[in-house]
Amino acid sequence: MAIATINPTTGQTIKTFDSLTDAQVDQKLQKAIDTFRSFRKLSFADRARMMVRAAEILESEKDSLAHLMTLEMGKTLRSAVDEAVKCAWACRYYAEHAEKFLADEQVETPASRSFIRYQPMGVILVIMPWNYPFWQVFRFIAPGLMAGNVGVLKHASNVPQCALKIEEVLVKAGFPEGAFQTLLIGSGQVDRILDDPRVAAATLTGSEGAGVQVGSGAAKRIKKVVLELGGSDPFIVMPSANLEEAITVGIKARVINNGQSCIAAKRFIVADQIADKFQHEFVAQMEKLKLGDPFDEKTDVGPLANAEAVTSLQADVSASVKAGAKVLTGGKPANLPGSFYLPTVLVDIPKDSPAYREELFGPVASIFRVKNADEAIRVANDSRFGLGASAWTNDKAEQERFINELEAGMVFINQMVFSDPRVPFGGVKRSGVGRELSTYGIREFTNVKTVWVK
């Protein structure tokens, strides 16, 4: 099987790679487990030196790394530069804090000594998507390797050069060659790797369907798995909110990464008394967005990742319109070469339509009108997903209600949802299990050992 990387801006094939054979995968898994036996014994200080060096490389090479990201998956160049810098931040954060996060925890018991020790699990299968081709991977690398684990990466098939470059950065930073290896393979080979006794656990960021497959595969083998899946994040705007700011941030939250982010705002839930003004200005700002070449500094929205993404998004929009939704702007692919979709706003959305029930992955905003906070919470929670939620209100009582009652792993008040190494990232319901980042993220891939000395 060949793995081709295609420029979504032009539709042209950039490069083609051969998939690894089963024998080649076996060699890499053996190299990983052999490396783990020595890598786990390194001190936190030794691993931190490598991680800081990785951060320095990410920062010094941010422009070339950004160019590669934009070339392979179409994010705007300036956002790709930001992504490289954010990866460096995560590396530095865990280099500084990993030892503290995983320090022995003393427990008061009748024993002469009793404590909890966190130890690395081993070889982790890392399955990552294309939408943040560096950041999604470094969200595992920084905590995972600082904890003493090693990783094998099955990256999305449309970003193979990004995957190989990540491995190159780590080797250049001084990590052993077996500490983090890229597997250029198809999805059909994943279950075999998950079944391999040398693989201790898995982490996946991806679709709900992929999560079900990998999660059930891990369960069959009694292996730990962390799943960060889809989101249909609500963006609630109440009468007391700063409306101008909410609209400006809402636009950014919807079209970030060309609308292809699990934590992008997708369902705009707006109080009736401000809905007309919100809707009018929101549509006006969406229509002003510049769609085009992601290498152009003036571009706001680049292409979707591939032609299949355009087809899927158009199918969801068309089905929603057929069910009764109205298009206020956009609603179709752009008349441009490549995989472009017009910034779109939908209203009057029926409950049985994709715009209500599914995660629309692209620059499509769905607006819902509600009477009050009660209805806003009900509509927001009427989803099988529960990743992030953003609520805009200056009413303290409403803020507390949203914090307590929204069914989401992350609730941001008067701010768009984003990831930050200092706080846990993850969702509830069908948005996944486990957490990434923060203290919680680094402990996900450790064995928690109870020690009791009489």
Listing of model-derived features with the role each one plays in the protein:
Residues 8, 22-25, 44, 62, ...:
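Residues at or immediately preceding the N-termini of alpha-helices
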Residues 36, 40, 55-62, 66, ...:
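Structural signal for hydrophobic packing residues in well-ordered secondary-structure cores
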Residues 5-9, 29-30, 226-229, 257-262, ...:
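Short, flexible turn/loop "capping" segments at secondary-structure junctions
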Residues 103, 107-245, 370:
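Rossmann-like NAD(P) dinucleotide-binding subdomain of oxidoreductase/dehydrogenase enzymes
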Residues 1-113:
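N-terminal Rossmann-like NAD(P)+-binding subdomain of aldehyde/semialdehyde dehydrogenases
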Residues 14, 209-350, 373, 413:
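ALDH superfamily catalytic-core signature
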Residues 10-16, 199, 236, 290, ...:
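Conserved C-terminal structural/oligomerization subdomain of aldehyde/semialdehyde dehydrogenase
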Residues 11, 32, 47, 69, ...:
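Residue-level signal for inorganic ion chemistry
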